[in-house]
From Swiss-Prot:
Its EC number is 5.4.3.8. GO terms for biological process: protoporphyrinogen IX biosynthetic process. It is found in: Cytoplasm. SUPFAM superfamilies: PLP-dependent transferases. This is Glutamate-1-semialdehyde 2,1-aminomutase. Its cofactor is pyridoxal 5'-phosphate. It comes from Desulfovibrio desulfuricans (strain ATCC 27774 / DSM 6949 / MB). The gene is hemL.
Length: 423
């Protein structure tokens, strides 16, 4: 059927590579075409054809308050009237930095950037400078943006030197990137036994939300902290997704493990482009202009994103996170039971306001497990839910999101749609 979305997608492909500005939006993984969105309010999207959807993607995480939250929208409009970019410091960037530092247990200082990729790239540079070492250990399936050192694919063995994961990344760039399976502390110990004196940092999603939703096993994060302490390496938490979502104080507050450095994005910008990295003062003061580690950005700390982030955190500081988690869990488990009643095996892990439908008989504890899930079943589920006005992430490797704007009526409509799905 010809639609305005389809027409726009055809036009877009003539001037934008693949017709989208981020690959997952193309919906190739689910044998579909993208929806072009005209507007969004609360937890509802309206596409350019006038169809409405209940949104469980939430712009991949930032919109925890829902779309067009009045206080946030007003803050952005007020900021825009004062000027959209100064190329100089503004008051809100100080206030937002203070708010982030106050919320996160491990932070003493924070630097604003423009994206999660910039944040992780800068944090790695800082860790290498602080330790005077070059290697970094990451986990297979964890995503830390598209900077070259993180675009690595696993070689053979549990923990090994990596090979490039995409054309255009020289082998030399990822030669210092080591990989291990997520949740495998023994593999990390083995890697450090071989290379520990050369490893600047471990970088990890404390909750792996880019292979679906994989929770850390008990003791895993604590074990990483102990290993880093033993070898005098830095522990970097990538909290671009979990920051202000796993808890107001992020995953580090929830699991009571303090990293040396933390990266942020998504929620701290209230829906505008933003990133940040922060940590202990002794490391952060190595950054220029105080120290010699260079990092800069024309739009870093831009007034619109700072205003949106400040308004968002102001609301979240008083928000009922426990209530949102309980509602998310009840919704996700109800959906799991509905699908299971159809004779289809489904795992549905949840944490805070995140959930993920894995079509598998087995618990998913790492990326290898996630890859074994039935993607054909997921594709069928996605397409049938979308046809009924339920917008889920168009990939089995992405987490679902719930906002404070979702109501019982929204959950019930989604569950009714799940009941009508045929496998």
């Amino acid at each position: 059927m010809d639609t305005v979305s389809r027409q726009l997608f055809e036009k877009a492909q003539a001037v934008i590579p693949g017709g989208v500005n981020s690959p997952v939006r193309a919906c190739h993984n689910v044998d579909s075409q993208p929806l072009f969105i005209a507007e969004a309010h609360g937890c509802h999207l309206t596409d350019v054809d006038g169809r409405q959807y209940i949104d469980f993607v939430l712009s991949w995480g930032p919109m925890i308050l829902g779309h067009d939250e009045p206080s946030v929208t007003r803050a952005v409009c007020d900021a825009a009237h004062r000027g959209t970019s100064y190329g100089a410091p503004c008051p809100d960037e100080v206030l937002l930095a203070e708010a982030v530092v106050a919320a996160m247990p491990s932070l003493e200082m924070v630097r604003m950037v423009n994206s999660g990729t910039e944040a992780t790239m800068s944090a790695l540079r800082l860790a290498r400078a602080a330790t005077r070492r070059d290697k970094v250990l990451k986990f297979v399936g964890c995503y830390h943006g598209h900077a070259d050192p993180f675009l690595a694919a696993a070689g053979s063995g549990l923990a090994t030197f990596s090979i490039p994961g995409t054309p255009g990344v020289p082998a030399a760039v990822v030669a210092d990137t080591l990989l291990a399976p997520y949740n495998d502390l023994e593999a990390v110990k083995e890697c450090f036994a071989r290379h520990g004196e050369s490893i600047a940092a471990i970088i990890v999603e404390p909750v792996a939300a880019n292979m679906g939703l994989v929770l850390p096993k008990p003791g895993f994060l604590e074990g990483l902290r102990a290993i880093c302490d033993q070898y005098e390496s830095l522990l970097i938490f990538d909290e671009v997704i979990t920051g202000f979502r796993a808890a107001f104080g992020g995953a580090q507050a929830r699991f009571k493990v303090d990293p040396d450095l933390t990266t942020f994005g998504k929620i701290i910008g209230g829906g505008l482009p933003v990133g940040a990295f922060g940590g202990k003062r002794r490391y952060m003061e190595l950054i220029a202009p105080r120290g010699g580690v260079y990092q800069a950005g024309t739009l870093s700390g831009n007034p619109l994103a700072m205003a949106a982030g400040l308004a968002t955190l102001g609301i979240l500081r008083k928000a009922d996170y426990d209530g949102l988690e309980n509602r998310t869990r009840a919704f996700a488990y109800s959906m799991r039971d509905i699908i299971a009643a159809k004779g289809v095996p489904l795992q549905m892990p949840t944490l805070a306001s995140m959930f993920c439908p894995y079509f598998s008989e087995h618990e998913v504890t790492d990326f290898a497990d996630a890859q074994k899930c039935d993607q054909k079943l997921f594709t069928s589920f996605y397409k049938q839910m979308r046809a009924q006005g339920i917008y889920l992430a168009p990939s089995g490797y992405e987490t679902g999101m719930v906002s404070f704007a979702h109501t019982d009526e929204d959950f019930n409509r989604a569950l009714d749609a799940a009941r009508k799905v045929m496998f």
